[in-house]
Curated annotation (Swiss-Prot):
It is a peripheral membrane protein. Keywords: Host nucleus, Membrane, RNA-binding, Viral matrix protein, Virion. It is found in: Virion membrane; Host nucleus. Most abundant protein in virion. When expressed alone can form virus-like particles in transfected cells. A motif (Nuclear localization signal) lies at residues 101-105. GO terms for cellular component: host cell nucleus; membrane; virion membrane. Residues 165-252 are annotated as: RNP-binding. GO terms for molecular function: RNA binding; structural constituent of virion. Plays critical roles in virus replication, from virus entry and uncoating to assembly and budding of the virus particle. M1 binding to ribonucleocapsids (RNPs) in nucleus seems to inhibit viral transcription. Interaction of viral NEP with M1-RNP is thought to promote nuclear export of the complex, which is targeted to the virion assembly site at the apical plasma membrane in polarized epithelial cells. Interactions with NA and HA may bring M1, a non-raft-associated protein, into lipid rafts. Forms a continuous shell on the inner side of the lipid bilayer in virion, where it binds the RNP. Its main location: virion. The lineage of its organism: Viruses, Riboviria, Orthornavirae, Negarnaviricota, Polyploviricotina. SMART domains: Flu_M1_C (SM00759). GO terms for biological process: viral budding from plasma membrane. The gene is M. This is Matrix protein 1.
Amino acid sequence: MSLLTEVETYVLSIIPSGPLKAEIAQRLEDVFAGKNTDLEALMEWLKTRPILSPLTKGILGFVFTLTVPSERGLQRRRFVQNALNGNGDPNNMDRAVKLYRKLKREITFHGAKEVALSYSTGALASCMGLIYNRMGTVTTEVAFGLVCATCEQIADSQHRSHRQMVTTTNPLIRHENRMVLASTTAKAMEQMAGSSEQAAEAMEVAGQARQMVQAMRTIGTHPSSSAGLKNDLLENLQAYQKRMGVQMQRFK
């Protein structure tokens, strides 16, 4: 796996699924391929994206700044600086300085990532802030190692919380999660339908599912009643994909 592929993988792992994720993936691909060279416009676009947390925006801004060539005098962006200040905690800053000194001795991406993984997310963000604010310099490879270590820690905590939700025994949360999944699956079916012959059928199934979810939310139902809805919808989607010749990896 090439270095940039690895960076893209880690960065995308912390972004919530949806149309915005696809858009960011495309931007990253363009930046890494040298197709997008307007850092100013890129940062302005990033700043106004909804949904993303300030830290995620800070990490993306850091990656764009590392990758896109720019004039030396280009201003640093406040939204990135604020996100990478370790919540203003002096402990994070102290640890960030210690980490920075260690990173200065590293020359490889993997070496830097290994060193960085033993620090907290706050310290890692502060260390990125040091480099972003030009208070310290490391090689691009080492900076990418720091980025990937930070993303790995964030993705780990997201995965833990996701697993807790999936394995929860609370029937109300499970019920709501099934309905949300049914809605998202319906949306995916509508997007995939396009102008194919089977489009009308897909749209009809998706429309029925949406109405069902709306009705369930309006009148309230027993928490187990949504299990069949989600499963039926997933089966319909998979059957539709087979006819379309589209094979999506386990869409769940």
